[in-house]
């Protein structure tokens, strides 16, 4: 059963803390699982007689150091050439681009409405997963962004072609990092233009030049388009601490049998 947030001071032995927790929890717990751990915050422990780690997801980040020009020069030639070509086309057509960044708590309700309109115009609407400003998901994002903005820890990026809103990012922040939670773009824009990529280029320049953050994080599982912007990918993980080593062995055997029955590979990460 879920217990709650795991929070510990740096330098402490996580295994020793878990073993002490076994004695403090009610009943007779056999396994304590710490899930979705970030190796940047807590290094992945080696496997041991009563410790087993499992891969969760790969996730991506950009270290905002060294200046934008050096960063941009390190991006793929195709990305740089493609976006330059798009900007030239927009200029020939007399279409000005504009990046706006909103941080005011009072601006977050409209931001969620604008985001919902963008996402609702695309494939997510057909799949039933698009954010809607008036549903539970939309209300959650509004409340969360307003609360974070009151702590100066939220931002919304809007990108325009002329007066038309064509792409958005919803972001949260802490002292050192900005996290891109969600991205949407206008899918009615001609396929020869990539508003989300054009927005990302200008947003990256702004972040490098601003110097406020040490890194940008792409929330969630790494996607193909993330790899156009960074090579920094790390694997988040789960770690199981077992009361006895025999339990770890039995758990691994059970999962291996299930995988064989399903025809899946039986290699165990960190076994």
Positions of PLM-derived features:
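Short catalytic-loop micro-motif centered on adjacent basic/acidic residues
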Residues: 31-33, 100, 215-217
């Amino acid at each position: 059963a879920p217990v709650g947030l795991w929070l510990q001071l740096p330098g402490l032995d996580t295994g020793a803390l878990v073993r002490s927790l076994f004695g403090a929890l009610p009943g007779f717990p056999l396994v304590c699982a710490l899930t979705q751990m970030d190796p940047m915050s807590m290094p992945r422990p080696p496997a041991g007689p009563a410790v087993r780690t499992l891969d969760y997801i790969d996730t991506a980040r950009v270290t905002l150091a060294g200046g934008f020009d050096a960063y941009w020069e390190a991006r793929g030639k195709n990305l740089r050439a493609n976006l330059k070509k798009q900007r030239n086309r927009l200029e020939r057509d007399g279409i000005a681009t504009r990046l706006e960044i909103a941080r005011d708590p009072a601006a977050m309700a409209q931001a969620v409405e604008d985001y919902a309109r963008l996402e609702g115009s695309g494939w997510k609407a057909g799949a039933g997963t698009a954010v809607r400003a008036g549903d539970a998901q939309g209300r959650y994002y509004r409340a969360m962004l307003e609360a974070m903005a009151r702590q100066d820890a939220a931002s919304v990026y809007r990108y325009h072609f002329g007066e038309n809103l064509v792409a958005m990012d919803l972001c949260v922040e802490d002292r050192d990092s900005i996290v891109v939670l969600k991205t949407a773009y206008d899918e009615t824009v001609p396929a020869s233009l990539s508003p989300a990529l054009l927005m990302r280029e200008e947003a990256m320049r702004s972040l490098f030049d601003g110097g406020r953050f040490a890194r940008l994080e792409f929330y969630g599982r790494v996607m193909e388009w993330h790899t156009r912007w960074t090579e920094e990918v790390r694997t988040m993980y789960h770690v199981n601490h077992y009361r006895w080593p025999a339990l770890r062995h039995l758990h691994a055997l059970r999962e291996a049998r299930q995988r064989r029955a399903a025809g899946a590979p039986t290699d165990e990460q960190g076994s």
